[in-house]
Amino acid sequence: MIKLKQLIAATLLLSTAFGVHAERLKDIASISGVRANQLIGYGLVVGLNGTGDQTTQTPFTLQTFNNMLSQFGIKVPSGSGTVQLKNVAAVAVYADLPAFAKPGQTVDITVSSIGNSKSLRGGALLMTPMKGVDGNVYAIAQGNLVVGGFDAEGRDGSKITVNVPSSGRIPGGASVERSVPSGFNQGNTLTLNLNRSDFTTAKRIVDKINELLGPGVAQALDGGSVRVTAPLDPGQRVDYLSILENLEVDPGQTAAKVIINSRTGTIVIGQNVKVSPAAVTHGSLTVTITEDPIVSQPGALSGGQTAVVPRSRVNAQQELHPMFKFGPGTTLDEIVRAVNQVGAAPGDLMAILEALKQAGALQADLIVI
């Protein structure tokens, strides 16, 4: 195998030969097992300006508060009645523990109210252990919250709320107490997982690594992962991966897709979408019903009674749009231009795309989310 120092020079020479669409390997793939881990905890935020939990409706807040006091040797008398706390809120604390995080390092945390607190603005999180999915404590969180939202309420009941005042963040608010075991330095191979599975991209990664390091160093396991041989020494392994992750690879083109969000009317058409020969016309029918009741007045001395008689007016109006034709291999630009010429709204475009798909003329996957 070529020495690492020679690999660095070879990498610099090869990287200049790639096209403008090449992407770094670190941007399209990740190393198996090297990932962040989620942490979660439960704690109390104190120091709120009367915007804390209503303990009569959230008894767990009062229970947590009493448990905290008991740890300091303070016991609330049972006959003291219901304690009302207005400046305390029960919160959920969560964070992502980065890969290779070491004890003593800090991570950002997010704090969210789980009771009926109106706002966490101005509050401070008390010491909260943060656990992983295995139940072990990996970090301790504490600090003053940064809340971007606020709310205000007048005596007449008028209220204004900006952003979300019931959630905030503490930059560097958790101190790492335990490292997560990693299999990074185990074995003589590493697996690269593609962010988006694609057989073409996987093959190009294998070809590029083998071109640089020699035949058989990289092997594609499937369309989403590539296994590479790696040095056993931890220091050499770091140097080795620093070379691999900066290799530039031309990723394969994505499959042709049309994404439709029926709730928001958003339509995203991929670059490779094409349409077979087809003729399309689309019109909309608008039906308007107007209620115009009239008063029926009986004649004099007829003995009748005045009555309100309903009268409805129904009007139907249909908008006619000209027919437009798609030729063979029509591209995205031509589709958009043709639809814009007839003034189709997003809802109309959805109907047109669905009809083209049903007719077999849309050469793409139609995905409705």
UniProtKB/Swiss-Prot annotation:
Q: Where in the cell is it found?
A: Periplasm; Bacterial flagellum basal body
One GO CC term, this protein: bacterial-type flagellum basal body, distal rod, P ring
Would the keyword Signal turn up in this protein's UniProt record? yes
User: Which InterPro entries does the annotation name?
Assistant: Flag_FlgI (IPR001782)
Gene Ontology BP annotations: bacterial-type flagellum-dependent cell motility
Q: Which family does it belong to?
A: Belongs to the FlgI family.
Function (record text) = Assembles around the rod to form the L-ring and probably protects the motor/basal body from shearing forces during rotation.
| Cross-referenced PANTHER family | FLAGELLAR P-RING PERIPLASMIC PROTEIN FLGI, FLAGELLAR P-RING PROTEIN
Assembly information from the UniProt record: The basal body constitutes a major portion of the flagellar organelle and consists of four rings (L,P,S, and M) mounted on a central rod.
Name by which UniProt lists this protein: Flagellar P-ring protein
The gene it comes from is: flgI
